[in-house]
Amino acid sequence: MKTTDSLIVLHVAYITSDFASGVSTVVPQYLNEQSEIKDMNIALLNLTNYRPKDAKYPVFHQSCIEKLPEPFCNPSLVIFHEIYRPDHIKLSHWLRRRAIPYIITPHGSLTYVAQEQHHLAKQLLNVFFYNAFIRNADCIHFLSEKEAMSSNGFKHRKASIIPNGVSIPKAKASNLDSRIALFIGRLDIDVKGLDLLIKSLPLIADELRGLGAKIYIYGPDEDGSMAKLELLIADNQVSDIVLLNGPVNGQSKADAFLQSQFYIQLSRTEGFPTSVLEALAYGLPIIVTEGTTWKETANNKGIGIGVESDLEAISNAILTLFNDDEYRCKLANAARKYAIEHFQWKAIAKRQFILYRDIVNGLSN
């Protein structure tokens, strides 16, 4: 039962059916968890016409807050997801005129590497619109310390670090014989470091063929990236090792995790990649770069191998996890345990609620 003095929290996001999008995957999950908190009344103002499957909260598609039904036409707090959405500017102006606080969750879009993409266009947009949007936010909610540290080129009032959570599946990957490594995500070759992955494989191609090892890549095409990846795979003569697939979701996605021995993501920039967290929850060790924000954690917590963006280091890590079953199983057990102890949604949603309450009450430091 929601109380009359519950926080009225409106999330504003661009959610689609593209499950390779971290925002479209993770935001509906934590809104479902937040909807269970008795002292918080939440809704989603979606900037598309899509309604998230199994949503336990109201979903609106009207981009004018004052026309929303009670109580969301007068929210206690608004959460903006991502930065470069034009509707955010209009809505933030409306909020400021009414002294309604707002939080921005950039989802990695303020990092140095992310800002280098379409650099000139972003510089102009920042000067005219988004610097003020960020500066006037009551808090910037980062998903990791790495994201916060690499986003310090922007002035803001306050910052908070709360990671995403993950639903822990009942099943655990335990396939000792599959010899499959996995990547799931947008097929953005540069951002996701897929060029690094493919170019590292010729260094160990003979060993991988001897093991019968495969690299499965799943994800949607990104501006013709599927064809570019196919050419890159052919040029590096690893077409028999790398299997390139379209996007995967639901049970098919679960099966992809369950049939794999480890997960690999070599991103150059991320906020807090959902697929890495999902892999840990299934008990898959991870091979990750600094850009994923997981490199130090992988090494320090014994849940995978953190590597430099170096072809030899990447190939050595891949071969190690394919060859050493005992070591890989040790990492796998630690990976699932780490996800269970630190990233279950219920605990994450409680931390988010405390942040929201403190912002509304003017208590955030």
Regions flagged by a language model, labelled:
Residues 10-11, 141, 173-192, 198-201, ...:
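Conserved donor-binding/catalytic core segment of Leloir-type glycosyltransferases
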Residues 46-49, 184, 213-228, 246:
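Glycosyltransferase donor-sugar binding loop
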Residues 72, 134, 247-248, 255-260:
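Short alpha-helical donor nucleotide-sugar binding micro-motif in glycosyltransferases
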Residues 97, 122-139:
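Membrane-proximal helix-turn-helix segments that form the acceptor-binding/catalytic region
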Residues 146, 165:
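Carbohydrate-associated surface elements
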Residues 268:
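Aromatic "clamp/platform" in nucleotide-sugar-dependent glycosyltransferases that forms part
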Residues 285-289:
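Short hydrophobic beta-strand element within catalytic cores of glycosyltransferases
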Residues 300, 304-312, 320-326:
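Conserved acidic donor-binding segment of nucleotide-sugar-dependent glycosyltransferases
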